[in-house]
């Protein structure tokens, strides 16, 4: 029976400061390191043995993946990194304090930017400070594929090819798979896996550093879902 484990990265430095993060390459906060280590211990206690691990190209997710594997005594497991598992790009909101942004634009508007399935944030230009267009880790991409901002719909469209080409085939081979990524890239994949509606996905929250286990049927429909 295929088994899939999602883990959002541990609390990041900008999570702790209540700032929009997106594609900004922010490190784990000390609390986030401990969350990731504890997640690894819970995986070990549950007896889950991975065949392959997938993560993004952002530091907070990569380190979380490493801690999860290290503290479950599986650091040798192959890891595959992809930009397609990156966090949702928050455009010009990246780096802004969420509370201050709500005071400026209103709680309702910020809630829509954060949780709506198909509303885009204010878009970042390629020439803006912090744009991924000049980041070496994305040098292999067509510039048109580098977003200036994303909603959850676009995040899913970006992540879905990686699911179809890499993750789903591994699961269909009956492998046990770890995906250590981000709140919104995991929400997007959860929407696809669970068939969550555009409306209901607004209410789905995935906590930091807490492994989410999917026990799947052979056709990759969900048999059981639970947190460790």
From Swiss-Prot:
The active site is at residues 9, 87. Catalyzes the interconversion of 2-phosphoglycerate and 3-phosphoglycerate. Belongs to the phosphoglycerate mutase family. BPG-dependent PGAM subfamily. Gene3D superfamilies: Phosphoglycerate mutase-like (3.40.50.1240). Signal peptide: none annotated. GO terms for biological process: gluconeogenesis; glycolytic process. It comes from the Bacteria. This is 2,3-bisphosphoglycerate-dependent phosphoglycerate mutase. HAMAP family: PGAM_GpmA. Pathway: Carbohydrate degradation; glycolysis; pyruvate from D-glyceraldehyde 3-phosphate: step 3/5. The keyword Isomerase applies. GO terms for molecular function: phosphoglycerate mutase activity. SMART domains: PGAM (SM00855). The record marks 182 as: Transition state stabilizer. It is an enzyme of class 5 (isomerase). Keywords: Gluconeogenesis, Glycolysis, Isomerase. Substrate binds at residues 8-15, 21-22, 60, 87-90, 98, 114-115, 183-184. Its EC number is 5.4.2.11. It catalyses: (2R)-2-phosphoglycerate = (2R)-3-phosphoglycerate.
